[in-house]
Amino acid sequence: MTNKHTKDVALVLASGGPRGFAYIGAIEELEARGYNITSVTGCSIGSLVGGIYAAGGLQDFKEWLFQLNNYKLLGLLDISLSKSYLVKGEKVINAIKNIVPDVNIEDLRIPYRAVATDLYTGEQVVFKSGKLFEAIRSSISIPSMFRPVRMGNHTMVDGGILNTVPMDIAVRNGHDLLVTFDVNQIDSDKIAASLAAYHEAKDKYSDSKLDIKGVLEQLPAKKEKSLLEMAKWVGDETHKLILKDREAHQKVKEIDKKAEEANMPFVEDDNYYSILSRSFSLMLSTVARLQLQLFKPDILVKMNFDSYGNITAYTKSTEISDKGRALLSKALDEYEKSL
């Protein structure tokens, strides 16, 4: 039974791509406020951040991660020619292992659990022993993105397919707080309203065209004017159209910029990555919502999955970590006030 005044925390970190860098700041906030993380359970990116924390390498990992730029990120992608997946996934794992040495899960300083999905049997695979980075690599294997991991009779892909927020396998000590961080929330009503407003505003200006033909068609009505006057009139009207067209293009850019700053998903082009990523995120959001109806953590921290949804978010780890810390701090404030 949970002791409401305990400082012990069983931490559960959900699947969620680059949004999971929020867990770095969240862990730092927990420790700064005197909480004692007694176990960590993670799925996909949650298994990565949680595993590195359990191995005592979070600070070194953070320093490496926070200096990544687009160029360095590309250098970590071992692109594959396979028709089944885009990235082999070994380069990035090896780069992290150079910073945080591999270790057996049973030798970690606190209990750790990671979850993957058996692609063929549909069963959940829970890692509680064996090599840490084998567990992490299995858990992060997003279908079509990373090469599946074969271990024994298992062919493993991302654990989020079955268990996005693995609260059910968390290691508890009988009096700890279950603290869950889910980065897969979606506000459908807000997105629908924003989508309607976005297209209404964009259509208003996108219809603007440089209609020189329309100006020329008005010339017969100006036949009483001299040739010089007509030429001047055409020039003036054309100039007005050009200014109007420039204004329209600028407005469209401003609308796109505001939507991007608000992390609205419809600003992105419908490319292979964005469609795959969003489809997978929608699945994670659905699974997470159902799990949170079944399991009630003592403290739940939530982040919208549109917060950092595209591939460039992997170079925004500092910003994401700071946001995670702020969200965790707010959740702790609310919990402590309720005591």
Segments from the language model and where they lie:
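Patatin-like phospholipase
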Residues: M1-C43, G51-L339
